[in-house]
Amino acid sequence: MTYPERKAFVSRITNETKIQIAISLNGGPISIENSILQREESDAAKQVTGSQIIDIQTGVGFLDHMIHALAKHSGWSLIVECIGDLHIDDHHTTEDCGIALGQAFKEALGHVRGVKRFGSGYAPLDEALSRAVVDLSNRPYAVIELGLKREKIGDLSCEMIPHFLESFAEAARITLHVDCLRGFNDHHRSESAFKALAIAIKEAISSNGTNDVPSTKGVLM
């Protein structure tokens, strides 16, 4: 099946954050014409290959790392720029990046037609193993059980990691279940969860070989 372009650009500006996101669910070339970044960029979450362009700049290093993993293993091209009120804490930046990414995903996906709708995935990282299940249901709901013990990983509060996923699911209008099944290193637990989610999303948005709406209702809206 030949997919439509499945690209989107989202600009979200509040008193707390300024965010720009460009996404292509199919990978390939994307760009942001006018960058909002006024700081020196980090190359830690930047990757350009023949099939993907990924550049994540939220100002929170571990959040960049998680979004990079999500984009990489979903097969997306993704650029995220955020200027947030990090002098307060990481809450608004993390939450708003989740919201903006969910909005961009929903816009890029368009009508849920001709795709599998459901996806699931497992991903290990050393001793950690996570499971994710996704439904492109237009019924936003998230159940996130990561079992994190630390207060922070780098500059990212551990309580904000599930909240990012909840914010993404709400804005994307998808049902999302993510569980870390085992593991003792919180970095590994978190990263395996984002990779499992990527695998699940990649399956859910893949072709089902028809042009049908995958619902007994005949609509997902």
Curated annotation (Swiss-Prot):
| Protein name as it appears in the record | Imidazoleglycerol-phosphate dehydratase
Q: Name one GO molecular function term.
A: imidazoleglycerol-phosphate dehydratase activity
Keywords tagged on the record = Amino-acid biosynthesis, Histidine biosynthesis, Lyase
Q: Which InterPro entries match?
A: IGPD_sf, ImidazoleglycerolP_deHydtase, ImidazoleglycerP_deHydtase_CS, Ribosomal_Su5_D2-typ_SF
- Write out the similarity annotation: Belongs to the imidazoleglycerol-phosphate dehydratase family.
Q: What organism is recorded for this protein?
A: Kluyveromyces lactis (strain ATCC 8585 / CBS 2359 / DSM 70799 / NBRC 1267 / NRRL Y-1140 / WM37)
State a single Pfam family of this protein: IGPD
Q: Which Gene3D superfamilies does its entry note?
A: Imidazole glycerol phosphate dehydratase, domain 1
Source lineage: Eukaryota, Fungi, Dikarya, Ascomycota, Saccharomycotina
PROSITE patterns, A to Z: IGP_DEHYDRATASE_1, IGP_DEHYDRATASE_2
- What pathway is this protein said to act in by its record? Amino-acid biosynthesis; L-histidine biosynthesis; L-histidine from 5-phospho-alpha-D-ribose 1-diphosphate: step 6/9
| Gene Ontology terms describing biological process | L-histidine biosynthetic process
